[in-house]
Amino acid sequence: FLYAVSYTCFVELMPCVFFDLMPFMRIQGFGKCMGISFVDSTMIPVCHNMRRKFNKVFDELTKNGKGTMGWCPGLKLHLLCNEIGDVLMFCLTPANEDDRNPRVWKVFTKVLYGKVFADKGYIKQEFFENLFNQGIHLVHGLSRT
């Protein structure tokens, strides 16, 4: 690996090449669904919360969303993987979008069948029934209500 970078450099370089990697992933990088899939979402902050009023680069694309580190403007990455860890599909939305967004799942259901394992953010009876009618069984954690 003559041109390999360290992990620290990789973390610094990743935001610079993230949007260049998306078209590559759409063309080359997706795996095949084998009947068992996993889905989750995570926040991609575009700037620190204190600088949100001055950030104009992603002004039209980003919304304020709450992640594990608190509120910040950013995007939400919805990621669908198969059981061996291959990315099946991904979708970027504003950070305040719900995990059960119908537009995201319209994209996901094109490559999906079988069982999908998700966290508690995907619990909703109507959403479960909609996927079940398409032949997709949603498996999620129990809600503590």
Residue ranges with predicted function:
Residues F1-T145:
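Short alpha-helical elements
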